[in-house]
Amino acid sequence: MAGKTLKVTQIGSPIRRTADQRATLIGLGLNKMHRTRELQDTPEVRGMIRKVQHMVKVDEA
């Protein structure tokens, strides 16, 4: 069963952010500006996105 996916793009820099926010970006596969990843739409991924919502842009794919 193919679930919904989210297109997540990093738009903010992790410089001068807390260590847990940087780790969350890495967990999402985002470690460079303007990098885009397609991730499964799960509650875990949504929680990670919410934690760094000021540094990412989310589109439904």
UniProtKB/Swiss-Prot annotation:
Keyword Ribosomal protein applies: yes
Record GO terms (molecular function): structural constituent of ribosome
Gene Ontology BP term (one): translation
Superkingdom per UniProt: Bacteria
Keywords: Ribonucleoprotein, Ribosomal protein
Keyword S-adenosyl-L-methionine tagged: no
PANTHER family recorded: LARGE RIBOSOMAL SUBUNIT PROTEIN UL30M, MITOCHONDRIAL RIBOSOMAL PROTEIN L30
Record's subunit section: Part of the 50S ribosomal subunit.
Protein name according to UniProt: Large ribosomal subunit protein uL30
Organism: Rhizorhabdus wittichii (strain DSM 6014 / CCUG 31198 / JCM 15750 / NBRC 105917 / EY 4224 / RW1) (Sphingomonas wittichii)
Name of the coding gene: rpmD
